[in-house]
Swiss-Prot record:
Region described as Disordered: spans on this chain: 1-30
The keyword Ribosomal protein is annotated on this UniProt entry: yes
Keywords (A to Z) from UniProt: Ribonucleoprotein, Ribosomal protein, RNA-binding, rRNA-binding
Stored PANTHER family: RIBOSOMAL PROTEIN S19P FAMILY MEMBER, SMALL RIBOSOMAL SUBUNIT PROTEIN US19M
HAMAP family: Ribosomal_uS19
Domain of life: Bacteria
Natural source organism: Anaeromyxobacter sp. (strain Fw109-5)
Task performed by this protein: Protein S19 forms a complex with S13 that binds strongly to the 16S ribosomal RNA.
MF terms in GO: rRNA binding; structural constituent of ribosome
Record protein name field: Small ribosomal subunit protein uS19
Coiled coil: none
Gene: rpsS
Length: 96
C-alpha cells in the first residue's frame, strides 16, 4: 500500500540536513547513511550516498530517474550466487 499523498514523502531529517549542508557548500562528498527507508527527493540528485546493506556500505549515485524511490532499493541485501549448472547437467543423463 502506498503512502498517503497528504503526508508527503518520508526522508530522515538528519539525511536532508546533510544534503542541504552539502548543497550550501557545493560539496559532493559521499554521504554515509543507514537510512534505507528514506525516499529520494529532488534535492538528492547528483549526490553519492553510501547506503548500508547490513554488512557494508554500497555507493549509490542518485540520478533523476531515482526520485520517488527508496534508498534501500539500490543497495541489495542478499547476494545471488547463481544456480548450479553442474547439478542440472548431472541429473539430465540419469533420466531415461
Amino acid at each position: 500500500m502506498a503512502r498517503s499523498i497528504k503526508k508527503g514523502p518520508f526522508a530522515d531529517k538528519h539525511l536532508t540536513k546533510k544534503v542541504e549542508d552539502a548543497n550550501k557548500g557545493n560539496k559532493k562528498s559521499v554521504i554515509k547513511t543507514w537510512s534505507r527507508r528514506s525516499t529520494i527527493l529532488p534535492d538528492f540528485v547528483g549526490h553519492t550516498f553510501a547506503v548500508h546493506n547490513g554488512r557494508k556500505f554500497v555507493p549509490v549515485f542518485v540520478t533523476e530517474n531515482m526520485v520517488g524511490h527508496k534508498l534501500g532499493e539500490f543497495a541489495p541485501t542478499r547476494t545471488f550466487h547463481g544456480h548450479s549448472a553442474e547439478k542440472k547437467a548431472a541429473a539430465a543423463p540419469a533420466r531415461k
